[in-house]
């Protein structure tokens, strides 16, 4: 960012929050594509090099300079001058440029807010596994949880309107709205969920920023009202950026719900409520009664419908008792159960036993959805029987084993926090036997005959259990050390869900 600050003249644009001129600067797109303008946007245009990539950007900027966007109507979508002849390439270039430009003011505000503030940066909190120690500490003491599916915006205009509350440059937002409108017209005159899905896949970074702005707006109101009775005592949620008309909207929002909730501070007062979220799924847990959880359910549904114009229904929020239902979160099944323990107490000459049964959070591998993901990837059939992977039969034996080993290690790494290892052993069995069947099919043999013919040392690394490594390194390791190794381990280097585990 510092390298491009002089080229983009960020100091001058930041004074008036002008983002519109940055769209017509080549360095914006160079920053967006990491110094190389053909990293992935030219995958469909083989033969272009860096110089020709720069020429594409220059021609696109010249075209945008010459166009009068007010004269272009929706009926002219077949002859679209905004994208030119190569719609896919130009839309990727523009979306990357829009994304990196709109991120600049947020980045500068974050840097300015951190200057002079003694804030310790915990980089390990970036890991999604860091959520589970929090769940293990808090959830055993709670009673009810609400599984919340945050509704998906039905129209891209909703995302632009949400961004309007934080970005002040009207010209930039107008061009952004026009870009999304023209992109939608190129696919269909009617904007549907399918067109939004296509846009999110072809422009992942840009759509992710718009969607995160929508989530940030929703959570800013949610946390503001949640902390209002305690005078905003919660400070661990991070840096709150400048936001336009926040208090005015909160007052209007309070008037809308004054009939249902006459006293909002009393309604929100719950010191034992906890909230976690990953992407579009969140969990709201409380120690209070089901009545309060149902009030929160009604409140959230009305919030989405009245404030964000997003259709939502009560079925998107399920309220369950933690002791009787499992939570499906981050591709783990988590449940609260009793953990009976007997403690011997000695008082003078008398000794007696105490039965203690504290609650404990169990995290388990979702075996059925995971087998479904393996079946979809052609590692096994629908019932979990391993099959050969046809697409890898043309690779060398070493490459086949190495790829299966990489998948197996990644799954073991992600599900290292599972309370019960039995389900993970079954997944490893499917992958190992699928590897053997793939090799046997390549050599035109059966799996049993292939194993008899090949030296088992060839598969030694693949078939060695993780629990066996500590015995190989420390042959006389204590039982407590081995038990600690076989227990739950939360790694702090996992920043996204494994591809096969993401079955939601």
Curated annotation (Swiss-Prot):
A cellular component annotation (GO) from this entry? chloroplast
For whether the record's keyword set contains tRNA processing, the answer is: yes
Q: Which InterPro entries match?
A: Domain_X, Maturase_MatK, Maturase_MatK_N
Q: Which UniProt keywords apply?
A: Chloroplast, mRNA processing, Plastid, RNA-binding, tRNA processing
Q: Which GO terms describe its molecular function?
A: RNA binding
Which one Pfam family would you cite for this protein? MatK_N
Chief location bin: plastid
- GO term, biological process aspect, one: RNA splicing
Entry annotated with the keyword Heme:
no
Q: Note the superkingdom of the native organism.
A: Eukaryota
Function statement: Usually encoded in the trnK tRNA gene intron. Probably assists in splicing its own and other chloroplast group II introns.
* Homology family: Belongs to the intron maturase 2 family. MatK subfamily.
Tell me the protein's name: Maturase K
In its UniProt entry, the species of origin is given as Quercus palustris
* Encoding gene (name): matK
């Amino acid at each position: 960012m510092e390298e491009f600050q002089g080229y983009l003249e960020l100091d001058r644009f930041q004074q008036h929050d002008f983002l519109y001129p940055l769209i017509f600067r080549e360095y914006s797109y160079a920053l967006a594509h990491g110094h190389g303008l053909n990293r992935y946007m030219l995958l469909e245009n083989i033969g272009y090099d860096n110089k020709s990539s720069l020429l594409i950007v220059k021609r696109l900027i010249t075209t945008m300079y010459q166009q009068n966007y007010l004269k272009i109507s929706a009926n002219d979508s077949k002859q679209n001058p905004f994208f030119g002849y190569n719609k896919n390439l130009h839309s990727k270039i523009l979306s990357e440029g829009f994304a990196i430009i709109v991120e600049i003011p947020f980045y500068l505000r974050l840097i300015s807010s951190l200057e002079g503030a003694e804030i310790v940066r915990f980089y390990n909190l970036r890991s999604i596994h860091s959520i589970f120690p929090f769940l293990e500490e808090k959830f055993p003491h709670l009673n009810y949880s609400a599984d919340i599916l945050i509704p998906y915006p039905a129209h891209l205009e909703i995302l632009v309107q949400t961004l309007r509350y934080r970005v002040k440059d009207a010209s930039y937002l107008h061009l952004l709205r026009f870009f999304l409108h023209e992109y939608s017209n190129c696919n269909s005159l009617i904007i549907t969920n399918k067109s939004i899905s296509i846009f999110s896949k072809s422009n992942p970074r840009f759509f992710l920023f718009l969607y995160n702005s929508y989530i940030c707006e929703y959570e800013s109101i949610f946390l503001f009202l949640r902390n209002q009775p305690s005078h905003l005592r919660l400070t661990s949620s991070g840096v709150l950026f400048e936001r336009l008309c926040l208090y005015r909207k909160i007052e209007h929002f309070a008037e809308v719900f004054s009939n249902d909730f006459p006293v909002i501070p009393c309604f929100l007062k719950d010191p034992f409520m906890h909230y976690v979220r990953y992407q579009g799924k969140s969990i709201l847990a409380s120690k209070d009664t089901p009545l309060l959880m149902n009030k929160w359910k009604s409140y959230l549904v009305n919030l989405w419908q009245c404030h964000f114009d997003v259709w939502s229904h009560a079925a998107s929020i399920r309220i369950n008792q933690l002791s009787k239902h499992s939570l499906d979160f981050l591709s783990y099944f988590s449940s609260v159960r009793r953990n009976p323990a007997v403690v011997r107490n000695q008082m003078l000459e008398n000794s007696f036993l105490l039965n203690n049964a504290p609650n404990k959070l169990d995290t388990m591998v979702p075996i059925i959805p995971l087998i479904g993901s393996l079946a979809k990837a052609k590692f096994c059939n629908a019932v979990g029987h391993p099959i050969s992977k046809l697409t890898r039969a043309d690779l060398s034996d070493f490459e086949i084993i190495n790829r299966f080993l990489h998948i197996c290690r990644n799954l073991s790494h992600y599900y290292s926090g599972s309370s019960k290892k039995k389900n993970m052993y079954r997944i490893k069995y499917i992958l190992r036997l699928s590897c053997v069947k793939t090799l046997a099919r390549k050599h035109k043999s059966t799996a049993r005959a292939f194993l008899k013919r090949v030296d088992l040392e060839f598969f030694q690394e693949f078939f060695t259990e993780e629990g066996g490594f500590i015995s190989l390194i420390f042959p006389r390791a204590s039982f407590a050390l081995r038990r600690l190794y076989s227990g739950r381990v939360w790694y702090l280097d996992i920043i996204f869900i494994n591809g096969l585990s993401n079955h939601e």
